[in-house]
């Protein structure tokens, strides 16, 4: 079975509940794999290096720790000289040489925009990679997928991805700023480390899952604009997840939210 240890919400940020994870590992010897998402979906929060290492250093556990970094290219750091792309430096990949039980997974589906090729990558020490190679299906990567992956991971492809990611990060900043002016929207939750924004929908000043669902259906069915209703997920009461688009797409979403949430019957 699955042992679930919910994230904790500290203010607007989601984080691993390290003490409870360690307690679960100490008391349940049946656990063989730990999955951590950094950044998470829909939390949009990058996990701290300290929390990942705390799990890796657990003396009561010798199974695998798998860190899913599907959204790793979207966080940023605020620097004195402006915005700096830091996707590589915040990855857990550089911990792999120090931990034989660590596997870090990434994908071409998000920042590279190649979801159709269905291709990802795992970083781990050679013995673990050998086990994966021994158990995977033969010829599991098609020739077209391999071709597009090689193009994406070329110096030119990575430069293009980084340029697009910088644009998205700026669009995300503008979207968050614009959402602050929408009536009956509450806090933006998470650290906004992914290509989406998680925001609370309010009724009478409190997060309302019912109203979030109403707005979600109105946007999709009446206006053809799809966001994600995440209000049923733990810690996400009343929340919609809005993917970051172009400035024009973001402006349309903000205008529609303003229209719907300014209407008491929405």
Region spans (language model):
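Conserved PLP-binding catalytic core of the aspartate aminotransferase-like
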Residues: 168-169, 181-223, 240, 244
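PLP-dependent aminotransferase class I/II
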Residues: 95, 101-181, 187-189
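Conserved active-site segment immediately N-terminal to the catalytic lysine
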Residues: 63, 78-109, 127-131, 240
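Active-site phosphate-binding strand-loop segment of PLP-dependent enzymes
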Residues: 12-79, 83-84
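PLP-dependent enzyme catalytic core of the Aspartate aminotransferase-like
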Residues: 50, 208, 221-222, 232-266
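Short acidic/glycine-enriched loop/turn segments that link adjacent beta-strands
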Residues: 116, 193-195, 234-237
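Short beta->alpha connector loops at strand-helix junctions that form conserved
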Residues: 5-11
């Amino acid at each position: 079975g699955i042992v679930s240890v919910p994230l904790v919400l500290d203010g607007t940020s989601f984080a691993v509940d390290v003490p409870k994870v360690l307690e679960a590992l100490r008391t349940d010897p049946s656990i063989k794999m730990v999955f951590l998402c950094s950044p998470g979906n829909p939390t949009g929060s990058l996990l701290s290096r300290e929390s990942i290492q705390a799990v890796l250093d657990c003396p009561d556990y010798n199974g695998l720790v798998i860190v899913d970094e599907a959204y790793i290219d979207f966080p940023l750091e605020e620097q004195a000289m402006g915005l700096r792309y830091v996707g590589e430096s915040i990855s857990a990949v550089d911990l792999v040489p120090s931990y034989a039980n660590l596997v870090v997974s990434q994908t071409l589906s998000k920042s590279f925009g190649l979801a159709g090729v269905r291709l990802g990558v795992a970083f781990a020490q050679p013995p673990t990679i050998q086990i994966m190679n021994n158990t995977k299906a033969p010829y599991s990567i098609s020739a077209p997928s391999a071709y597009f992956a090689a193009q994406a991971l070329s110096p030119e492809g990575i430069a293009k991805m980084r340029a697009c990611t910088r644009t998205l990060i700026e669009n995300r900043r503008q979207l968050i700023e614009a959402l602050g002016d929408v009536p009956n929207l509450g806090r933006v939750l998470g650290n906004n480390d992914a290509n989406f924004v998680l925001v609370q929908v309010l009724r009478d000043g409190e997060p309302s899952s019912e109203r979030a669902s109403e707005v979600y259906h109105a946007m999709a069915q009446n206006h053809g604009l799809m966001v994600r209703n995440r209000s049923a997920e733990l810690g996400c009461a009343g929340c919609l997840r809005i993917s970051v688009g172009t400035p024009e797409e973001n402006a349309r979403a903000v205008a529609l939210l303003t229209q719907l949430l300014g209407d008491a019957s929405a």
